[in-house]
């Protein structure tokens, strides 16, 4: 049975929603963990790296910055300096051909369908904007950057806070009720719904169902009707 919604803008999470959570956790996180210390040591003096380390030091007190970064990654903390450094490390892996990013086939078909219908597509992820762009540039389906109209990371606010979604709506220039947000995370859906955004729970793999939200297991069951408001 199709889920039919009116929409002006599409907002999407990445991990667990349009891409495999295991790719991010096993491949990308594994790559950055194994290389973090050497990557930082080889780039001391790089202004961006030094700014990241200063931010880490301010947050971690007397803890060694690399040790703090590794601990944050192991705990899957969504901390901005960690996300920025991960993006830099992952960029080197993409460019060296160490891996290509994953995207679900059904999600990619739907994204192209939404785009062809005139719906702008935006990403909201805890990964840095830089890391998001790289993810879609080096995908298993080729360079997908042209699909997206913009990217948001936690610089705009936490993904579990309603104010973040209101800020995104304000930035895009769309009424929250005209935005449809897809995510696998109920806490994110709660926050978006509190801001007045239409939400859809994406249930892939081992993601548990949640009866509070409209739910899909395959993007082919979603029909978005593009109805621009004045």
Curated annotation (Swiss-Prot):
Upper taxonomic lineage: Bacteria, Pseudomonadati, Pseudomonadota, Alphaproteobacteria, Hyphomicrobiales
Record function comment: Bifunctional enzyme that catalyzes the enolization of 2,3-diketo-5-methylthiopentyl-1-phosphate (DK-MTP-1-P) into the intermediate 2-hydroxy-3-keto-5-methylthiopentenyl-1-phosphate (HK-MTPenyl-1-P), which is then dephosphorylated to form the acireductone 1,2-dihydroxy-3-keto-5-methylthiopentene (DHK-MTPene).
Class in the EC hierarchy, top level: hydrolase
Cofactor binding summary note: Binds 1 Mg(2+) ion per subunit.
GO MF terms held by the record: 2,3-diketo-5-methylthiopentyl-1-phosphate enolase activity; 2-hydroxy-3-keto-5-methylthiopentenyl-1-phosphate phosphatase activity; acireductone synthase activity; magnesium ion binding
Annotated keywords: Amino-acid biosynthesis, Hydrolase, Magnesium, Metal-binding, Methionine biosynthesis
Catalytic activities: 5-methylsulfanyl-2,3-dioxopentyl phosphate + H2O = 1,2-dihydroxy-5-(methylsulfanyl)pent-1-en-3-one + phosphate
Subunit structure: Monomer.
Name of this protein: Enolase-phosphatase E1
Gene Ontology annotations of biological process type: L-methionine salvage from methylthioadenosine
Catalytic activity, EC: 3.1.3.77
UniProt superkingdom: Bacteria
Leader peptide range in chain numbering: none
PANTHER family linked to this entry: ENOLASE-PHOSPHATASE E1
InterPro entries: Enolase-ppase_E1 (IPR023943), HAD-like_sf (IPR036412), HAD-SF_hydro_IA (IPR006439), HAD_sf (IPR023214)
HAMAP family, per the entry: Salvage_MtnC
Cofactors: Mg(2+)
Pathway(s) this gene product operates in, as recorded in its UniProt entry: Amino-acid biosynthesis; L-methionine biosynthesis via salvage pathway; L-methionine from S-methyl-5-thio-alpha-D-ribose 1-phosphate: step 3/6; Amino-acid biosynthesis; L-methionine biosynthesis via salvage pathway; L-methionine from S-methyl-5-thio-alpha-D-ribose 1-phosphate: step 4/6
Family affiliation: Belongs to the HAD-like hydrolase superfamily. MasA/MtnC family.
């Amino acid at each position: 049975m199709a889920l039919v919604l009116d929409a002006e803008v599409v907002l999407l999470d990445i991990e667990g929603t349009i891409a495999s959570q295991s790719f991010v956790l096993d491949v990308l996180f594994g790559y950055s963990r194994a290389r973090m210390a050497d990557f930082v040591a080889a780039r001391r003096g790089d202004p961006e790296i030094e700014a990241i380390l200063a931010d880490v030091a301010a947050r971690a007190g007397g803890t060694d910055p690399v040790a703090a970064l590794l601990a944050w990654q192991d705990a899957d903390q969504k901390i901005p300096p960690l996300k920025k450094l991960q993006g830099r490390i992952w960029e080197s892996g993409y460019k060296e051909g160490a891996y290509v990013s994953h995207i679900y086939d059904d999600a990619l078909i739907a994204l192209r369908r939404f785009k062809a219908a005139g719906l702008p597509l935006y990403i909201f992820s805890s990964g840095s904007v830089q890391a998001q762009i790289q993810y879609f540039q080096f995908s298993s389906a080729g360079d997908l950057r042209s699909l997206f109209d913009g990217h948001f990371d936690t610089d705009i606010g936490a993904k579990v806070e309603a104010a973040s979604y209101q800020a995104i709506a304000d930035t895009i220039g769309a009424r929250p009720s005209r935005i449809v947000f897809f995510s696998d995370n109920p806490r994110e859906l709660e926050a978006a719904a509190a801001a007045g955004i239409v939400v859809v729970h994406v249930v892939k793999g081992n993601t548990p169902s949640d009866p509070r939200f409209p739910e899909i297991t395959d993007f082919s069951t979603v029909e978005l009707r593009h109805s621009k408001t004045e």
